[in-house]
Amino acid sequence: MATEHRHSTVRDEQTNYDYVSDRVERPELVSDLEALVDGDVRFDTYTRQLYATDASAYEQTPIGVVLPDHTDDVAAVMEYCADEAIPVLPRGGGTSLAGQTVNEAVVLDLAAEMTDVVEIDVKAETARAQAGVRLGDLNAELEPDGLKFAPDPAWGDKSVLGGAIGNNSTGAHSLQYGKTDYYIEEAEVVLADGTVTTFGEVDIDTLRERGEAGDDLEAEIYGTVAEILDRDADEIAATYPDLKRNVSGYNLDMLVDELRGQRRLPDDSGIDPDSEPGSINLARLLAGSEGTLATVTEATVSLEPIPATASVALLTYDDVIGAMEDVAPILEHDPAAVEVMDDVLLDLARDTTEFADVVGLLPDGTDAVLLVEFYADDDAAGRQKVADLVADRVPDADTEADPSDGAASLTEAPRTAVGAMEAHDAATREKFWKMRKSGLPILLSRTTDEKHIAYIEDTAIPAENLPAYVADFQEILDEHDTFASYYAHAGPGVLHIRPLVNTKTAEGVETLESIADAVTDLVVEYGGSVSGEHGDGRARTQWNRKLYGDDLWETFRELKSAFDPEWLLNPGNVCGDHSTAEQLRFDPDYELDAGFDPELNWDTDNGFEGVVELCHGCGGCRGPQETTGGVMCPTYRAAEEEIQSTRGRANMLRQAMSGDLDDEPFDDEFVEEVLDLCVGCKGCAKDCPSGVDMAKMKAELTHEYHKRHGSSLRDKLFANFTTLAAYGSRLAPLSNLAQQLPGSGILQEKLLGIARERSLPKFHRETFVEWFAERGGASVSRADADRQALLFPDTYTNHNHPEAGKAAVEVLEALNVHVRIPDDV
């Protein structure tokens, strides 16, 4: 029996705030749309610039942004835009690495309000949810029932269901679970003309009949899909790469397999027993279509049981080629994941405080590792799988379990691994995965003009061809006098390779184009795909003709025209005219001028400008606290607004200093809208993958702002709160009575800009420091103590919440710790 669940992040009154600037583009368009929808319509300058970027290397200012409340809002916007010939772009979490969600269009932000989990059917193992629900939130609701949505993209806690469908997302465990397309059962969609319909399974005869019987857009779609399958099925089957991971172009090969009753299981172990010839699921055609065919507003997806346990083997190698040679034989052991990390990342990780201890577990001389993970029904089975793998690939290494008979000769492939480690408990497995996942943060923390940007980072190659492909790829990099790291999903042949390039120069852009052209030639030569999981977008659309040939390229365009006759849906992507080297965030015309001389020291960051440009837009700051590293970003969690995220603030600051915004970062509106609500907690400095320190940047900018504009009474009050608190404690309890006087709330709002509903901190007559001295200091002497602690009470602990300090002292002394309080605090 189906059970209904609801999850929504609709904002409450506490977060009701005007998050837009005063300048609005195209007010007549805004007026028309506001009359049609219940959701927000935002065409102001700030909002448009916030949505000009995603997690990719690209930037383009949209026409405006609509935050729809429901499917009817989406339909109204798309119908209106179709009538007015205005492009439309659906967007989720903005975590795209190829620029899929960057375009000159009206952006539909489905992640703002359309976040409900509509229904979970535990017996059928399906869930129905709106397109804007975060995958992490969906899986949190499924976990009590032992189920999950299986595809696990790296930013699954921040990315959303609609984005996973639009991108045909997958993740590190695609060897086990495949791509999103396998799990789509049904989708509610809005077509280019605003028609709301449902796509799901349909037999080919019905497809033809509906195409012939109608004269509307939906009939045109059905008829064209049937015609393409009748005409081009053989060519599609022969031309598409034979890979587990291919998301380039449109998902026509999935439909051909379904039509022929040959849809494969997600782990590629055979034909799906439910695959019957003669029918297709039209919803699965939308997987990987990047919003160019229709907008998905709701979807029913199938689910998988959460594995009982997992075990990890970490194999070490002298070089990355040796690791690549070992991938194909490792796959014979049916792992759930095979991940690679090369010497570039291992060397960088050794120099970091966060990852040095993990890399230190590796034997000396290790220049590459493969992390191999197995799912198992119990710990014993997991240990057995690791033992069998190690017996086959590193027979001299010890294992916790005895290998099975014959395991040592399972593959008879040449052995290249030189060592092996294993992990079965959750803490050690997490350490190994932490080392693997350290790669991207380290690469993206570079503050120089040269960046490891994503544009050919997503190629997919058959495992048996990986050694030759990596060797040839390295030759291309050597010819262009640059380097890259080889890491990520070796099992399905998807290596995330990001060459170091400087696109701020014409020579750098030429290098980018030349490398992309040469690498895509290699991809075709080795039977691969230009995109294994990150999609086409702006980065790779231009290479689809090379990959598929002229005939299928024209088939793509025929399909696009059937769904979107005026080419208004995310135009330019998949089979359009987007170029890898156009609309780059940093290009030869880009200039950044801070407009002042910084006071703080930024020498280790390539100057203040280097830090301003550091955010690459991954969206790691967008999400619940448990998904962002622990602290980052409290204002985003309170407001669920892009402008209150670290990414939003960093992007706005860069755009203000580069001229994309008319405002300077010292203008009143910029300070109020972008910087004011940053609490300066430095959570971003700790948790951001790139190490963006918005608190330090805010301090620099606030100092310059006060130099130019002076300081208000409110600013002076907060800046000198320690002095104020000292007087407050001396005058307590009289100082606490002031806020109880009639009209005090109105006065504090008018004079200090503090909301009248906000109660002010109460002061204690006896401060924490006075209490500690009055009790005679520490009750545990230094001589008798096991340890010592120096306790630094801040202003609030000392004057407003001394009970917190007292409790800390009591706990420490209960543990036989000698406590000291510094003098003059």
PLM segments and residue spans:
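Generic hydrophobic alpha-helical scaffold/packing signal
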Residues: 253, 327, 390, 470, ...
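Iron-sulfur-cluster electron-transfer modules
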Residues: 325, 361, 446-450, 663-825
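Active-site-adjacent "gating/activation" loops or surface patches in catalytic cores
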Residues: 482, 647-650, 783-784
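Noncatalytic alpha-helical scaffold of FAD-dependent oxidoreductases
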Residues: 1-91, 95-486, 495-532, 542-627, ...
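Short connector loops at secondary-structure junctions
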Residues: 342-348, 430, 653, 815-825
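Hydrophobic, well-ordered secondary-structure elements that form the walls
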Residues: 534, 564, 633, 678, ...
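Active-site-proximal, well-structured secondary-structure segments within enzyme catalytic domains
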Residues: 492
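Ferredoxin-type iron-sulfur electron-transfer modules in oxidoreductases and energy-metabolism complexes
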Residues: 587-618, 622-728
